[in-house]
Amino acid sequence: MKTLLLTLVVLTIACLDLGYTKTCFNDDLANPKTTELCRHSMYFCFKNSWIAGGVERIERGCSLTCPDIKYNGKYIYCCTRDNCNA
C-alpha cells in the first residue's frame, strides 16, 4: 500500500504543471535567434530600439513590468506571448 501511494505521489509531481514559463528573444540582432526562459515573475517580453551614432540599437528580454516611456527617440515595445518581441 505504501508503494502504491508513493508511486501515485511521484507520478502526480512529475505530471503536475508547476507553472507556465514565458520565453522571450534576448539578443540584439535585427533577426533574433536566441531565447531565454523568463523567471516566474516576469510577465512581459520587451524590445527597446533606438538610433545611436547613426546605427539602430536593439535590446530584448524579459521584464516584470511594461514601461511605456518613449524618450529621446527610444522606442519600447512590450507583449505577453512567447517570443513576441522579434
UniProtKB/Swiss-Prot annotation:
Q: Please provide one cellular component term from the Gene Ontology annotations of this protein.
A: extracellular region
For this protein, the parts annotated as crossing the membrane are none
Q: Which family does it belong to?
A: Belongs to the three-finger toxin family. Short-chain subfamily. Orphan group IX sub-subfamily.
Q: Which organism is it from?
A: Bungarus candidus
Organism phylogeny: Eukaryota, Metazoa, Chordata, Craniata, Vertebrata
What GO molecular function terms would the record report? toxin activity
Q: In which tissues is it expressed?
A: Expressed by the venom gland.
- Matches recorded under InterPro entries: Snake_3FTx, Snake_toxin-like_sf, Snake_toxin_con_site, Toxin_cobra-type
Cross-referenced CDD domains? TFP_snake_toxin (cd00206)
Q: Which domain of life is it from?
A: Eukaryota
Query: What Gene3D superfamilies would the database entry show?
Result: CD59 (2.10.60.10)
* The keyword Protein transport appears for this protein: no
Looking up Pfam families in the UniProt record yields: Toxin_cobra-type
Q: Which residues form the signal peptide?
A: 1-21
Could you identify this protein by its name? Candiduxin-1
What keywords sit in the KW lines?
Answer: Disulfide bond, Secreted, Signal, Toxin
The protein's location, in the record's own words, is:
Secreted
Disulfide bridge positions per record: C24-C45, C38-C62, C66-C78, C79-C84
Enumerate the PROSITE patterns for this protein: SNAKE_TOXIN (PS00272)
